[in-house]
């Protein structure tokens, strides 16, 4: 990993910044990205660059968390709106919107409609490989952990 990392020209702070650096600034030969960002890159470069998405056979299932913070929603008198939004996300219509924006839908019927967009991958979770998000954070990103070891200049 350290050898691979030594070839990184720009390390942006997030996925969208990395996408911009790769697509708009033309820096780098490979972009390792979230699936939705890869599809956006393909869409953005379709007319002027030769970009291809390479799907691994195994990948991590990264699901953004969604929740209603009841106390905050009640304070702002938006509890019903927040609850309805959450319900919408898991409705067929919401899942369709999710898929159109290149996020993997969990609704099987919607997923089958987008099977050409979302390749069949063996997906694992953080719990599968680290036991918990806390364990993964400590192992990979705490001071002196794997990320620090990979990125150190020594």
Predicted regions and their residues:
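A generic structural signal for short, solvent-exposed coil/turn residues
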Residues: 45-46, 58-60, 115-118
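Ligand-binding pocket segment of bilobal, Venus flytrap-like solute-binding proteins
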Residues: 1-56
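Small-molecule pocket liners
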Residues: 62-66
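Solvent-exposed, acidic/flexible segments
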Residues: 11-12, 31, 56-59, 75-82, ...
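Solvent-exposed loop/turn segments at secondary-structure junctions
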Residues: 36-40, 58-61, 72-74, 104
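Extracellular/periplasmic juxtamembrane helices and adjacent flexible linkers that interface
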Residues: 72-154
